[in-house]
Design a protein with these regions (language model features):
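Noncatalytic, basic helical substrate-engagement surface that gates or grips nucleic-acid strands
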Residues: 2-135, 146-163, 168, 244-259, ...
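Non-catalytic nucleic-acid-binding/docking modules located in mid-to-C-terminal regions
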Residues: 5-6, 60-63, 151, 166-298
């Protein structure tokens, strides 16, 4: 890497890739069990996604971030947080540990902290390297839009392994006409059905965005309640505690201190030694992907 050039860190939302891979194949009844009969469809898809992202975005460094269990500090704030989510399928359960173990074996840096979500780890890494590195985040979670800044872009997974919808801060500001951090305030009003918190009942994304465009923040809207229509004012007044709580739940925590040197995030070599290990472990689809992307079979 040119010493005058900023490092480029690829941050992978491990859970997003793992779940996406699991559901994409389990829907057709494909679990790809290993020699012990344990499903590997999610694990192999996760690694294939991550390897493809490396080949597309060409980072100099990389880390994978993981959720560590269901309970986080947000559950302490609100009992209903993610309470509406079903338990993972039995075929998925063993693949959580398998995915992280394989990620470590490949040589990727992995982060996971009990009580925190992968979003919070990604956010903290973004803040830690702010101004010192370019960052690309690979995820499927729109919550991460709040992390956009000049050196950060977010690649949302679309169809297949190599199609992404990439957001920069400029694109976000042009489309939403607010700053990325103000995205938190829009979610305070709309809530998040997938995360199980309601926001303000009766206020949808369009109204929420208009309110933040005009008044800047949740507190700005509250200060201007008398200027709002009677219907909107009544809805906000009825759900004021939940509005403020929803903003807390929507905000990504960015103050975890990892204090790792950049070298800890070095990319591993995709070499013949790693290939042989993957063959022995039965990860044939990963091996084919690695051969295709990095010519490791030669």
């Amino acid at each position: 890497m040119n010493t005058d050039q900023k490092p480029h860190i690829l941050l992978i939302d491990g859970m997003a890739l793992l779940f996406r891979s699991f559901f994409a194949t389990s829907a057709m009844g494909h679990y790809f069990p290993n020699a012990e009969g344990v499903p590997t469809n999610g694990v192999q898809g996760f690694v294939r996604h991550a390897m493809t992202a490396v080949s597309i975005f060409k980072p100099t460094h990389m880390a994978v971030c993981w959720d560590m269990g269901m309970h986080t500090f947000r559950n302490d704030l609100f009992d209903g947080y993610k309470a509406n989510r079903p338990a993972p399928a039995p075929e998925m359960v063993p693949q959580f540990d398998m995915a992280r173990e394989l990620s470590e074996k490949i040589g990727w840096k992995n982060y996971g902290i009990a009580g925190m979500e992968a979003d919070d780890l990604i956010g903290s890494l973004v803040c830690e390297w702010d101004g010192k590195a370019e960052v690309t985040i690979v995820t499927g979670d729109k919550d991460l839009l709040q992390l956009l800044r000049p050196d950060v872009k977010i690649a949302f997974m679309k169809k297949g392994y190599n199609v992404y919808d990439v957001y920069t801060e400029d694109r976000f500001r042009e489309e939403y006409e607010i700053s990325p951090m103000q995205f938190i305030d829009t979610k305070a009003f709309t809530g998040d059905s997938s995360d199980g918190y309601p926001g303000v009942k009766g206020i949808g994304p369009k109204t929420a965005l208009k309110l933040i465009q005009q008044y800047g923040s949740v507190e700005g809207v509250i200060e201007a309640l008398e200027e709002l229509s009677a219907g909107t004012r009544k809805k906000i007044e009825a759900d004021m505690p939940m509005l403020r709580l929803s903003r807390q739940l929507a905000e990504i925590h960015c103050k975890l201190d990892f204090d790792d040197p950049l070298e800890a995030l070095n990319l591993p070599d995709f070499n013949s030694g790693l290939r042989e290990e993957l063959v022995e472990m039965g990860y044939t689809m990963i091996v084919r992907q690695m051969d295709s992307l990095f010519q490791t079979s030669i």
